[in-house]
């Protein structure tokens, strides 16, 4: 039977519930337990797919094609369980499902209410998402006291009663601020946060005390006394220089022992040697490179969370400190390519819309003409094709129909038909809704022997995740290939271009898929590892 650890946050947002939850999950997995994780988001959007990156950050795409919260990326980087559409749901998704059932008459004319209908649907999805895991960690987004979170908190209160205390526990993250002028930490915010939880029938079993200073033993004793939590379950979690230290920090304080004993689980001790190696490689690099990352959402770097982590993983794999130079593509439009000078490689990530695209195209041209290693992802591949068409082919009006529907040379256009991961045919047109209408999820890709990308993966066929609705225009592709554009990756049916390279360039690879979604700190990712190696070669050459 599955045991549940419900994770809530108090006092302020952005305390790191996702990282703390994933770190505990990693320790439990290291003890031989089967672990999964869920994220419950209180916002009313059906999913984050149409939300602004400036508001929500990255949209993480699962293997089965769900557009989900970026915390699922943390989950997959810390544990080896692959997330699915069942591991993340929102208030909007819950209400959509309940209202659809009401319209069908499934409730037999009953008055639909938050309790029991909404809370029952939340509980049903938690149980379904947990599956057959030994332990499921369920993170509730937002902060205790938010009106949006109330149905979720009520649902977990009910579920705790239904499954019993031997199968459910509550872990609460809270802020313990350090007052520099007084030279001490303050426990009052934590006391009030727990008081808020207890007022709705939820008693925490574990408190994770976030602070920029260690929470000393006397403060932990005081917190335990006022919150009715065992002193050994009051955990100090201060800021660290790498998040991959956190499993070790929690393990050193006995959190996993407490959980295992509380649930009555029989399992081995935790082997965290893999995490020790990750931390050692991260903190003791032997090399250093600078990579210019040219994007359009630089005001909120969470928009590129998985990509930034993937570059860190590539650094770990190569024992290299990767310095990312964040450059807004609009700044290149206004200030020119001087912003790129001195970079050992250039990375252009995905994005949507016209703003900043010309700056990205200029960055591609700089990389191609100056033989600087280049990696383009999603839109980064599309702008690479546009740049090639304009500056090698001489098609000065070349563009994507996303940006110019009247382009005389639309080298990138809307995908109107493709097969999804199950083999079912998907069709789209310009009038399709924005939400949930992209080519999403894992797709097989055939790689050309002898190509740079094949050298990285060492395979003929790979599987990577996608999130796009535009592709290279096959009608103009033969002319691009004749001029020297190398198509080194195609969809399984050969219909869609997945990877392009530049002939006569030391390392120029652009892919339509998002390899960052499958990169992990323990295993890295072959494409990013190859990119960092190319950057090292470029630096050594200089």
From Swiss-Prot:
Which sites bind UTP?
13, 186-191, 222
| Taxonomy, superkingdom | Bacteria
What keywords is this UniProt entry annotated with? ATP-binding, Glutamine amidotransferase, Ligase, Magnesium, Metal-binding, Nucleotide-binding, Pyrimidine biosynthesis
Binding positions for ATP per the UniProt entry: 14-19, 71
Name the enzyme group at the top EC level.
ligase
Q: Name one GO molecular function term.
A: metal ion binding
State the EC number(s): 6.3.4.2
Which annotated residues bind Mg(2+)?
71, 139
The pathway entry for this protein reads as:
Pyrimidine metabolism; CTP biosynthesis via de novo pathway; CTP from UDP: step 2/2
User: What reaction is this protein's catalytic activity?
Assistant: UTP + L-glutamine + ATP + H2O = CTP + L-glutamate + ADP + phosphate + 2 H(+); L-glutamine + H2O = L-glutamate + NH4(+); UTP + NH4(+) + ATP = CTP + ADP + phosphate + 2 H(+)
GO term, biological process aspect, one: 'de novo' CTP biosynthetic process
**How is the activity of this chain controlled?**
Allosterically activated by GTP, when glutamine is the substrate; GTP has no effect on the reaction when ammonia is the substrate. The allosteric effector GTP functions by stabilizing the protein conformation that binds the tetrahedral intermediate(s) formed during glutamine hydrolysis. Inhibited by the product CTP, via allosteric rather than competitive inhibition.
- Annotated residues for binding of CTP: 13, 146-148, 186-191, 222
Tell me which Pfam families the record gives. Answer: CTP_synth_N, GATase
Could you tell me which residues belong to the region Amidoligase domain? 1-265
The UniProt entry annotates the active site at: 378, 514, 516
Q: List GO terms (cellular component aspect).
A: cytosol
Q: How does it assemble?
A: Homotetramer.
Q: What does this protein do?
A: Catalyzes the ATP-dependent amination of UTP to CTP with either L-glutamine or ammonia as the source of nitrogen. Regulates intracellular CTP levels through interactions with the four ribonucleotide triphosphates.
Task: Give the UniProt family note.
Answer: Belongs to the CTP synthase family.
Q: What is this protein called?
A: CTP synthase
Give the species.
Answer: Pseudomonas putida (strain GB-1)
The gene from which this protein is expressed is: pyrG
């Amino acid at each position: 039977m599955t045991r549940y650890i419900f994770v809530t946050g108090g006092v302020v947002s952005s305390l790191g519930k996702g990282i703390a939850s994933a770190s505990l999950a990693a320790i439990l997995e290291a003890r031989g337990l089967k672990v999964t994780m869920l994220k419950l988001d209180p916002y009313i959007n059906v999913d984050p797919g149409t939300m602004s990156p400036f508001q929500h950050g990255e949209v993480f795409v699962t293997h089965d094609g769900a557009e989900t919260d970026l915390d699922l990326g943390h989950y997959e980087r810390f544990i080896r369980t692959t997330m699915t559409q069942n591991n993340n749901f929102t208030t909007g998704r819950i209400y959509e499902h309940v209202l659809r059932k009401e319209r069908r008459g499934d409730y037999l004319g009953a008055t639909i209410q938050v309790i029991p209908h909404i809370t029952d649907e939340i509980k049903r999805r938690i149980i379904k998402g947990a599956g057959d895991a030994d332990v499921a960690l369920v993170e509730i987004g937002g902060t205790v006291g938010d009106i949006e979170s109330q149905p979720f908190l009520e649902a977990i209160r009910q579920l705790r009663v239904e499954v019993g205390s031997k199968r459910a526990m509550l872990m609460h993250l809270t802020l313990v601020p350090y007052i520099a002028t007084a030279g001490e930490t303050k426990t009052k915010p934590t006391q009030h946060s727990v008081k808020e939880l207890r007022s709705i029938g939820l008693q925490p079993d574990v408190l994770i005390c976030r602070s920029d200073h260690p929470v000393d033993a006397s403060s932990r004793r005081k917190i335990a006394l006022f919150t009715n939590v065992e002193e050994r379950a009051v955990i100090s979690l201060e800021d660290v220089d790498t998040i991959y230290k956190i499993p070790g920090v929690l393990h050193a304080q006995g959190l996993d022992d407490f959980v295992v004993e509380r649930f009555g689980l029989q399992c081995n001790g935790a082997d965290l040697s893999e995490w020790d190696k990750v931390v050692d490689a991260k903190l003791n690099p032997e090399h250093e490179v600078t990579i210019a990352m040219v994007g359009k959402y630089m005001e909120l770097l969470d928009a590129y969370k998985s990509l930034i982590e993937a570059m860190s993983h590539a650094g770990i794999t190569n024992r290299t400190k990767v310095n990312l130079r964040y450059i807004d593509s609009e700044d290149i439009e206004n200030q020119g390519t001087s912003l790129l000078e001195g970079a050992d490689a250039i990375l252009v990530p995905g994005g949507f819309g016209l703003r900043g695209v010309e700056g990205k195209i200029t960055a591609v041209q700089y990389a191609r003409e100056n033989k600087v290693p280049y990696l383009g992802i999603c839109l980064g591949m599309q702008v690479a094709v546009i740049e090639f068409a304009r500056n090698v082919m001489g098609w000065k009006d070349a563009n994507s129909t996303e940006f110019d529907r009247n382009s005389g040379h639309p080298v990138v256009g809307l995908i109107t038909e493709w097969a999804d991961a199950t083999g079912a045919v998907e069709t789209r047109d310009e009038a399709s809704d924005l939400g949930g209408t992209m080519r999403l999820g894992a797709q097989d890709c055939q790689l050309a022997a002898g190509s740079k990308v094949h050298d990285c993966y060492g395979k003929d066929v790979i599987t990577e995740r996608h999130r796009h609705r535009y592709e290279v225009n096959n009608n103009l592709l033969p002319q691009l290939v004749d001029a020297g554009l190398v198509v080194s990756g195609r969809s399984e049916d050969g219909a869609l271009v997945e990877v392009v390279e530049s002939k006569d360039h030391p390392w120029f690879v652009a892919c339509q898929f998002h390899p960052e979604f499958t990169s992990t700190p323990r295993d890295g990712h072959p494409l990013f590892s190859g990119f960092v190696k190319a950057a090292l070669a470029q630096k050594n050459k200089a």
